[in-house]
Amino acid sequence: MKNDQKYDIKVQVRTTYLQDQSDPAQEQYVFAYTITINNIGSVASQLVSRHWIITGGDGETREVRGLGVVGEQPLLKPGESFEYTSGTAISSIAGSMKGSYQMVAEDGFHFSVEIPEFILSVPRVLH
């Protein structure tokens, strides 16, 4: 088995615009994102840290780094998944996020998992 199959983590993202927490008059648009992390590899691996790049539609970019996710550093055995919901605010009606998780496998191998870019967008309202 190749290493990339041995250490194989899949990331899926769903987003929701939080209208009740947003304040367009103050250019604050709040979004929730739910992430599902699946270990489809053959070795248990622990998520130890995260790195986000958050970009607003105006081109403003900020980076966020930290240990774990939502206060946890989940250990995922082969076939297991972990899901969490978090949020962010941007100053425009659309933007994006992307990043990576830093993982450590039970055999001590350190690797990075890409979080594919996803869109944050206020839904259009039809009158």
Curated annotation (Swiss-Prot):
PROSITE patterns attached to this UniProt entry: APAG
Domain of life assignment: Bacteria
InterPro entries reported for this sequence: ApaG-like, ApaG_domain, ApaG_sf, Uncharacterised_ApaG
Domain ApaG residue range list: 3-127
NCBIfam families per the UniProt record, alphabetical: PRK05461.1 (NF003967)
Protein name: Protein ApaG
Origin organism lineage: Bacteria, Pseudomonadati, Pseudomonadota, Betaproteobacteria, Nitrosomonadales
Gene designation per UniProt: apaG
